[in-house]
Amino acid sequence: MTNILSPEKSENDQELPIRPSYLQEFVGQQQIKENLSVFIKAAKSRNEHLDHTLFYGPPGLGKTTLAKIISNEIGGNFKSTSGPAILKVADLAAILTNLEKNDVLFIDEIHRLNTAVEEVLYPAMEDFELDIIIGEGSAARSVKITLPKFTLIGATTRLGLLSNPLRDRFGIPMRLNFYNTEELKKVLNRASKLLDIDLTDSGSEEIAKRSRGTPRIALRLLRRIRDFAAVEGKSRVDKEVSDFGLNRLEVDRIGLDSNDYRYLKFIADNYNGGPVGIETIAAALSEQRDALEETIEPYLIQIGLLQRTPRGRVITIAAFEHLKMSVPNQSHHQFNIFNENE
């Protein structure tokens, strides 16, 4: 699923010039920032490595950025990979044996590591040792390699898919939450200065309100609205220009786009609001289940338009109202929603 409101990283998201490098530059996630600052200062004062850290939550909220910030704050090198990229134990061994003291190893989508790789990672995280088998058959022998004290930072959008043994080995688990409008305005204002965009307060607020609580989306929308402003001969991005650009991009007043409407209308039209299983929805919309669960559903749940129940997905009365549709058997629909969540 690719669209302007996808929180997933795109090749067109050129974030390097505006990506913050240190905690004091990072906007939002205040409690996480404050706690990380304490943990980093404490580790440096003891001349120890920072405990392994796990960032989890919806995509586009700053997990990769925070990992790079930690690397900068502790003064180590930053090495980045992803769960799907580590196919074999040998792949992981090659990465680990090239680390130096205080390096940060960032593994994105860490929930997608295979079991064999995970088992090798356990002693590396706990004891900073790598146990590998050299040779085959009767000539095979185990070799133990001592690793430097490094910090592993894992990132996942699917905490429930992370195995318990791996999850328990992270000393610092942190959940990233959606941003509010004021926080997104600060993100946009900071970016507009770095990108030399004349962004007014009203223009910033209009973009922020329609960015699904996600900085990555807000920054992407800012770039596209800048394009509309340039072509329309507008030197300043105010509310009118922002509204014009967002309407052209088919982003409505609460941040929904055509994919969200397809999702909600399918449940409303075909199942009277639900419940309906996610596999049925995915098949009907010709989308992958993961794409729906990671890209569309989190925001719909966050703003109260969707509920997940044991029997399936149910859209709320607020969703019917936003779609300008009548609620079928309203009292019965409300009762079922609450009943399923008991």
Swiss-Prot record:
ATP binds at residues 18-19, 60, 63-65, 126-128, 169, 179, 216. Gene3D superfamilies: 1.10.8.60, P-loop containing nucleotide triphosphate hydrolases, Winged helix-like DNA-binding domain superfamily/Winged helix DNA-binding domain. Keywords: ATP-binding, Cytoplasm, DNA damage, DNA recombination, DNA repair, DNA-binding, Hydrolase, Nucleotide-binding. The keyword Flavoprotein does not apply. It catalyses: ATP + H2O = ADP + phosphate + H(+). DNA binds at residues 289, 308, 313. Homohexamer. Forms an RuvA(8)-RuvB(12)-Holliday junction (HJ) complex. HJ DNA is sandwiched between 2 RuvA tetramers; dsDNA enters through RuvA and exits via RuvB. An RuvB hexamer assembles on each DNA strand where it exits the tetramer. Each RuvB hexamer is contacted by two RuvA subunits (via domain III) on 2 adjacent RuvB subunits; this complex drives branch migration. In the full resolvosome a probable DNA-RuvA(4)-RuvB(12)-RuvC(2) complex forms which resolves the HJ. This is Holliday junction branch migration complex subunit RuvB. It comes from Rickettsia rickettsii (strain Sheila Smith). The gene is ruvB.
